[in-house]
Amino acid sequence: MSRFSQQYGGVVLKGLVLIALVASVAAYRILPPIDDPSLQGPETVLVSQVRTMPASGGNRVYWGDLHIHTSLSSDAFTMGVRAVPDDVYRFAKGQTIRHGAGYPVTISRPLDFAAVTDHAEYLGQARLSGLDVPTTRQRLGDLLADENRLTVTQSWWEIMSLIRDNGFKLTLEGVDSAINRSAWQEIVAAAEQHYEPGVFTTFPGWEWSADAGDVGTHLHRNVIYGSSDLPGIPFSSIDGETPPELWTFLRSEREKGRRVMAIPHNPNLSEGLAYRVASETGERIDRLSPEDRSDLEPISEILQIKGSSETHPLLSSLDEFADFEIAGTVPGREMTLTSVKGGYARDALRSGISMAHNEGFNPLKFGVIGSSDSHNATSPSDEKGYTGKLPMMD
């Protein structure tokens, strides 16, 4: 049975409407007056009795996290993470696991669903190589406090050299496909082991981590599957580095009968590219029909550790809360109206509605979710029990 259509106590969760804030409204039925002479006095006001009826069907709200990394992500491993996919699901279910910094962590309230979304690029390579790098031996605060300002830079160069020396090679099939496949099998096995229909749902998936031009201009998507019928290896940005190439892959997966979708995240770091539908010359950048984009990417992740992607003060000048949890700037760049337009959900939805009126189609129809992007194998959504993003930063 598809994970995208599961039975939860008689209520069907259709699609991934994960945070649909739908209230169950009680139905009321007015009953006839009670035939009781004692209630018919001159000073008595007769009020029809109201009885509540249980709501039938409808939607329920379920809580989960569709963006969690483990030591299979090379950036997580080189920052001190040693947790595995099994730890993600144990933590999400309420069990205690060990944080990368060495202390035990437990979620305050178990989740209903979760997904391990390790980076498809270099999947499992750093862990297999057992890289011993500065960022796994020393906390970032200590590195930054070092009197020698070159320490951090030297640390990063040491990481890059070790990655190169340990055979992180690019091929047309991806990065060392044998290692990739093995790591992917570990992710799938953990999802199958912890999947409890009607109790706890796991979603196999990965993160497609493409950057436009330079690192820091994010076009990242999480690819989420709703069934156990899966490809043998993740599709990474090495296999296809543009969103249209990813969409073509997703469409081919759909044609094989696999239920899959992509969730864009951190559009706030995309330099306005995340929700752009045409180039500066007006040419459409997606080669699919307008309906395909909203079908393949029905939701966007607009809140996580790297800031809010709902709106920006430059786009919503009259909204006094528009600066809530804004990430600030893309590293090394100043945020301008040009760089933020196309990078925030509220403006994108408005653009989609405008396109529907003016051009007769809307490729920007989507719902919204919040996720963590934790690289600690945890879901740090509780302020009092915040487990951070990476051990070297926590």
Region locations from a protein language model:
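Generic intrinsically disordered, low-complexity segments enriched for polar/acidic and small residues
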Residues: 1, 5, 25, 59-60
